[in-house]
Each structure stands twice: as structure tokens, then as C-alpha cells.
Amino acid sequence: MRGAGAPHRTRVKICGLTRLEDARVAREAGADWLGFIVAGESPRRIAPAAAGAIVAALPGAAAVAVMVAVTPDQALGFARATGAARVQLHRVDPAGWPADFPLPVTFVVPVRADGRLQAPLPPDHLLLMLDAHDPVLAGGTGATLPWATAAALAATRDLVLAGGLDPDNVEDAIEQVRPWAVDASSGLERAPGLKDHERVRRFVAAVRRADAVRA
């Protein structure tokens, strides 16, 4: 995924989508990935079939099926029902994941406030996401993580930075961490699962401003 010579374009994932109108706005704003939480406790959880209907209504959209503590067979079933091009796994050990899984996988590693990682890192060839640790929720808490920890890892591998990102802090986050991608959910909402369209647009615009400086 890393390339030399070309200006970096930070990928954007808008997660916790539950409505077609929100997904459409995210895509029109320039989001690269649309995230749907299809397995796991979350106020933003959506049935795989409902997520699949949204994806089907947006031809060409790249959907990510977000899941917590699933088996490979479960993950594949949820992904197929969603029409997802990628799966994002929380609370799954990458060491036990089959190498021949047919879809790209993002493994999420929670980070404590003191910078300690709460799960093993996946191998470098697999995409890593860092999110703020929470003892109950797997994501979408609105809490940020220590960006210095993320920056140290981003210097050695591609990673997705999550955890409390919003239109007001994402430029600083990109400047400090220099991630391959950013992920936002609760920071773009007016209520859990209901996106604030103006905040979505502002978020993507802020990422592009950060990229212009980074170039």
C-alpha cells in the first residue's frame, strides 16, 4: 500500500452508518469506505441485510463489514450479506485467522490511555487499525488514543487511525500521526447512528486540507 514519489492521499472511512441518506452523503463527500457494524454490541448496529440494501443502492461503493469476536465463517457470511469489500475485526486474534480468507481484513488493536496496546499486532502485510480502548464497547466511544503511540507505528507500517476523530481534530491527528487512513463515527453524529451531514462533509474536507500540507 505504501508507494514512493506520489503525494499521499489519506483514505477516509465513515463508520457506524445505518441510513442510506447518510451513506450517500459520505460517499459524495469523498469517503473511500463506508462502514457498517453488522456484528457486536453497538448503538450503531445494523442488520447485514439492511446494510446490504444500502450498499446495493450505491453502485461502486466500497463497504466495510465491521464485526466483533466472530469466526472466519461468520465473518464471511456477514460480509457477503452486506456486500462488503473488506472486513474489520475487533477482538479477534490475527494469529488464528486463515491466510486464505477471501476478503481483505483490517484488524483493530485497542490502545490504552497510557499507550499500551491491548491486543497483539497483526503481521505487517495485514492492515492495522488503532482505536481507543474501552472495557465494554469495541469502538465508537468518542475517546481519543495517545497519538504518539500511533505515530511510532505509522512510521513503520500502514495503519488506520480511529478513536474520537472529528472535523476539528483530524488535521492535527494527520499531522502528528501521518496515518495511511482515518476512521470516524461518533464524532460525525447528531445521535448514535444518525450522521450530521455537515460534519461528514467538514471531516472529509479537513482530511484533504491536511493532505495538501502533508504533500
Go through each PLM region and give its residues.
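Conserved N-terminal beta1-alpha1 strand-loop-helix module at the mouth
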Residues: 1-215
